[in-house]
């Protein structure tokens, strides 16, 4: 049986759409996975799962977005991680450990730290492209907001400065991930 860490371009190539659907179905129903499902389908499903969480693993903040390129240091990485909720921190650490295992086999799987940091920085810090407009029926009447997707007619684009914050935050998160994925990092 082939391990995912031995699969060429794992996390860098999308899995087959039908296989990904079957993986999601098995996860939803608790049924067994098809033994012939590709590692790429599992990897794609994991990325989609992380990217569709109700809140991102690493919340995009002005602080993360405003870091200057040469100021991303191991010490700063520790400060950033101390500010996220413990559950998010644990998920981040578990995935970093797994990605380091994949990098140990880079001669076999063709995967680089830069490529993994690029992919995972986007799913760790994703933001919704649209936000609900106030008063569009999301209020349940008792002050609580419903957790529902908003129809496209009820959304507005985020301001340009918000988009720039997202781009800068994701770029800085990529730099943070490169530090965590490096052989030198002992945090």
What residues fall within each predicted segment?
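Alpha-helical catalytic/interaction cores of small GTPase-regulatory modules
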Residues: 1-187
């Amino acid at each position: 049986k082939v391990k995912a860490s031995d699969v060429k371009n794992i996390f860098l190539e999308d899995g087959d759409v039908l296989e990904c659907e079957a993986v999601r179905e098995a996860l939803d129903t608790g049924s067994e996975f098809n033994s012939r499902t590709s590692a790429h389908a599992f990897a794609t499903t994991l990325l989609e799962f992380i990217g569709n969480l109700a809140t991102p693993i690493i919340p995009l903040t002005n602080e993360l977005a405003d870091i200057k390129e040469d100021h991303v240091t191991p010490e700063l990485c520790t400060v950033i991680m101390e500010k996220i909720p413990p559950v998010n921190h644990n998920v981040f650490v578990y995935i970093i450990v797994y990605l380091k295992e994949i990098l140990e086999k880079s001669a076999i799987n063709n995967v680089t730290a830069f490529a993994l940091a690029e992919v995972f920085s986007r799913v760790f810090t994703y933001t919704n492209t649209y936000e609900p407009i106030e008063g569009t029926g999301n209020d349940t009447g008792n002050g609580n907001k419903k957790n529902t997707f908003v129809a496209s007619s009820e959304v507005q684009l985020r301001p340009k400065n918000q988009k720039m914050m997202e781009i800068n935050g994701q770029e800085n998160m990529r730099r943070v991930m490169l530090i965590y994925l490096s052989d030198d990092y002992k945090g």
